From Swiss-Prot:
It is found in: Nucleus. This is DNA-directed RNA polymerases II and IV subunit 5A. The gene is NRPB5A. It comes from Arabidopsis thaliana (Mouse-ear cress). NCBIfam families: PRK09570.1 (NF007129). The keyword Amino-acid biosynthesis does not apply.
């Protein structure tokens, strides 16, 4: 059974996750964003376990583009758990997931993630990272990931190679928040006092 402190933590983590997924373009109901701690506990019950929070979400504009959120029970996640998750994903044709871990992954589990990365895209966040939404603390401008077609148009319009664009590291906290992958180009829109808005592009490396 989870302690009062753990319930409070998980409530905050869940809230950050829902905000993050909405920012990535997934369908998140308003009620999921405005849920209070009391509603959260009522929904999941006093005997809530981490695995009760497992969720499957789809993109707003594409129902088939789905993502799982897993909350492993063990503090250090090993290969066995990873295999269980990927088998579940495979059987349901879901190729992307977020793991919210209490501490970390074992070295073997890390290796497992890179070995399956061509088929499954698994993102790992520690619970501590998700207690606060980074966007509430840093002034984060709007980020839009370009589609392959939009990226091609952009490069042709400016006659540049993608590698000539300014870069953003895939490990950057903001890149992780938006779930960016290497090779993608992200459009960043900042408010500008003179031009109304100021647009830049970054290449994810």
């Amino acid at each position: 059974m989870l302690t009062e402190e753990e319930l409070k933590r998980l409530y905050r983590i869940q809230k950050t996750l829902m905000q993050m997924l909405r920012d990535r373009g997934y369908f998140i109901a308003d009620s999921e964003l405005t849920m209070t701690k009391q509603q959260f506990i009522r929904k999941h019950g006093d005997n809530m376990k981490r695995e009760d929070l497992v969720t499957l979400k789809a993109k707003r504009n594409d129902n088939s583009d789905q993502l799982y959120i897993f909350f492993p029970d063990e503090a250090k996640v090993g290969v066995k758990t990873m295999k269980m998750y990927t088998n579940r994903m495979k059987s349901e044709n879901v190729f992307r997931a977020i793991l919210v871990v209490q501490q970390n992954l074992t070295p073997f589990a890390r290796t497992c993630i890179s070995e399956i990365s061509s088929k499954f895209h698994l993102e790992v966040f520690q619970e501590a990272e998700m207690l606060v939404n980074i966007k509430e603390h840093v002034l984060v401008p709007e980020h839009q990931v370009l589609t392959t077609e939009e990226k091609k148009t952009l490069l042709e319009r400016y006659t540049v190679k993608e590698t000539q664009l300014p870069r953003i590291q895939v490990t950057d906290p903001i890149a992780r928040y938006f779930g960016l992958k290497r090779g993608q180009v992200v459009k960043i829109i900042r408010p500008s006092e003179t031009a109304g808005r100021y647009v830049t592009y970054r290449y994810v490396v």
